[in-house]
């Protein structure tokens, strides 16, 4: 089934792209959530008229992503966890905990967009990549200290 994307969808396409997807994916996810329209001739004509608006929306989303990336780049998360004598944590710091800490500081990010090379299991300073937009990534500084 062909659909016209109304939002940027990772691994699928950008706003305004006409893509072919499985019918179930379109019916059960993309169309009900408002992420896409069915690619009919009527919707294609409406898309032609809305191209300028979509381009404006793309630029606006990209600019918002860049502003958010600048906020995240200036952010340093300080976490305190219980640790053993060798600095090994009892448990691990995961992307979900980082998302909660960022939310507490006023930046709401989906935990799936925070990428850790591996879960943090030791005390020290670490970096995490935050994938805000397909074209915009930010680096988050994380410091884990002993509680």
Swiss-Prot record:
Pfam families reported for this sequence: Ribosomal_L9_C (PF03948), Ribosomal_L9_N (PF01281)
Keyword Ribosomal protein found: yes
GO cellular component, one term: ribonucleoprotein complex
Cited InterPro entries: Ribosomal_bL9 (IPR000244), Ribosomal_bL9/RNase_H1_N (IPR009027), Ribosomal_bL9_bac/chp (IPR020594), Ribosomal_bL9_C (IPR020069), Ribosomal_bL9_C_sf (IPR036791), Ribosomal_bL9_N (IPR020070), Ribosomal_bL9_N_sf (IPR036935)
GO BP term, pick one: translation
Keyword annotations: Ribonucleoprotein, Ribosomal protein, RNA-binding, rRNA-binding
GO molecular function: rRNA binding; structural constituent of ribosome
Role according to the record: Binds to the 23S rRNA.
Similarity section: Belongs to the bacterial ribosomal protein bL9 family.
Name listed for the protein in its UniProt record: Large ribosomal subunit protein bL9
Species whose genome carries this gene: Geotalea uraniireducens (strain Rf4) (Geobacter uraniireducens)
Organism lineage string: Bacteria, Pseudomonadati, Thermodesulfobacteriota, Desulfuromonadia, Geobacterales
């Amino acid at each position: 089934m062909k659909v016209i994307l109304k939002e940027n969808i990772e691994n699928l396409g950008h706003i305004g792209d006409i893509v072919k997807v499985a019918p179930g994916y379109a019916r059960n996810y993309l169309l009900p959530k408002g992420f896409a329209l069915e690619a009919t001739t009527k919707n294609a004509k409406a898309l032609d008229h809305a191209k300028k608006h979509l381009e404006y929306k793309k630029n606006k989303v990209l600019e918002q992503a860049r502003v958010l990336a600048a906020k995240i780049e200036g952010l340093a998360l300080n976490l305190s966890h219980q640790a053993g004598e060798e600095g090994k944590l009892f448990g691990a710091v995961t992307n979900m905990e980082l998302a909660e800490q960022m939310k507490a500081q006023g930046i709401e990010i989906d935990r799936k967009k925070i990428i850790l090379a591996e879960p943090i299991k030791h005390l020290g300073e670490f970096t995490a990549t935050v994938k805000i937009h397909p074209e915009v990534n930010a680096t988050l500084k994380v410091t884990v200290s002993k509680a």
